[in-house]
């Protein structure tokens, strides 16, 4: 009997919209509404400073887009806001800092108004994400299990997720489907991915249940829970990264995870991008490179805008190895369209394989 064929999923924010979660643009809108409501409270000077900082960051993002010839009215997402805030917070550690004669007076002014304003702003984002990305009831996330229906005889499923939420993990646990995610006894240990036949989950941008502790290192609070989690879980922000440049820092676990993605696509027969908008240049470069290196690799785009996404990316546009399913994730998964397309493409690659 032939070994199961390697099939890779790339999960974007659109995967979880059907479960009731907001995408990154809507999360940015929620952040503004939250800060505006807090700033309207009597004597809440901190909230007013954070709201002004939010407006300053939004203005900077749009100004930069205009300078680059891009549409400054394009929607800003939560990752772009968080990235800007974190870069400003740690601006004095930037290698280019010695060459900057002066930072914007507005940054200095806002920091004078509220000590640690940028740190507090980042903390607010992390705290709100935990609330806004909370896992819905089990019936709303059951459709996510359809991604792993072929795992076993037909395929070996690996899921690379760009999402911070815990919907996928909870869905698999509810369905009693074992998986590995790089943690053993609550501590980061990527060796668990090796030689394991379970479903594999790689969270490229981090996870709401990951933290970094000075004593225990990189730990998980839920899947699976570190035995000492109660000692540090309250005061630790989740271990997340925002934006492409963060992935280029070489920091673990993110270096290991993105390397695993690049390596996986060397041998994968099918890559299914579900709810991914192809807005991450670094991830796109990896996919483009592997489409050149791994000729049997087929790519399936699952999105209501799948055709538009294909046409707007030159390395996808004219490729006969790229197919589109113009559906939301829930319909495409529950109605069997994704499963059928994977099986069709696996059969196609078998017929093309040399004897």
Q: For the regions a protein language model found, what residue spans apply to each?
A:
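A general structural signal for short secondary-structure boundary/capping elements
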Residues: 55-63, 201-211, 317-322
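Short flexible/disordered coil segments
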Residues: 67-79, 218-231, 314-317, 326-346
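Active-site gating loop/helix substructures
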Residues: 103-138, 170-259
């Amino acid at each position: 009997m032939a070994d199961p064929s390697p099939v890779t999923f790339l999960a974007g924010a659109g995967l979880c919209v059907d479960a009731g979660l907001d995408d990154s643009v809507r999360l940015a809108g929620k952040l503004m509404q939250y800060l505006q409501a807090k700033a309207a409270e009597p004597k809440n000077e901190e909230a007013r400073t954070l709201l002004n900082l939010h407006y300053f960051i939004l203005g900077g993002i749009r100004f930069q887009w205009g300078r680059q010839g891009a549409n400054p009215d394009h929607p800003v997402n939560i990752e772009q806001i968080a990235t800007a805030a974190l870069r400003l917070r740690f601006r004095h550690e930037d290698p280019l800092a010695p060459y900057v004669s002066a930072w914007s007076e507005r940054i200095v002014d806002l920091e004078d108004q509220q000590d640690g304003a940028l740190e507090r702003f980042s903390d607010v984002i992390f705290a709100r994400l935990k609330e806004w990305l909370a896992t819905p009831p089990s019936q709303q996330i059951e459709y996510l299990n359809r991604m792993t229906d072929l795992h076993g005889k037909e395929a070996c499923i690996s899921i690379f997720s760009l999402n911070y939420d815990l919907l996928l993990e909870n869905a698999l646990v509810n369905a009693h489907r074992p998986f590995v995610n790089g943690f053993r006894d609550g501590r980061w240990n990527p060796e668990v991915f090796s030689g394991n036949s379970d479903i594999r989950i790689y969270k490229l941008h981090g996870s709401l249940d990951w933290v970094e502790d000075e004593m225990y290192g990189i730990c998980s609070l839920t899947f699976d829970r570190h035995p000492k989690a109660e000692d540090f879980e309250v005061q630790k922000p989740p271990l997340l990264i925002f934006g492409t440049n963060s992935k280029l820092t070489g920091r673990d676990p993110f270096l290991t995870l993105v390397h695993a993605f690049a390596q996986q696509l060397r041998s994968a027969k099918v890559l299914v991008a579900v709810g991914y908008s192809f807005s991450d240049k670094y991830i796109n470069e990896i996919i483009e490179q592997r489409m050149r290196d791994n000729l049997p690799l087929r790519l399936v785009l699952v999105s209501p805008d799948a055709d538009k996404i294909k046409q707007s990316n030159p390395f996808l546009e004219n490729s006969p190895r790229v197919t589109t399913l113009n559906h939301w994730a829930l319909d495409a998964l529950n109605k069997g369209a994704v499963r059928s397309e994977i099986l069709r493409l696996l059969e196609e690659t078998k017929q093309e394989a040399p004897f």
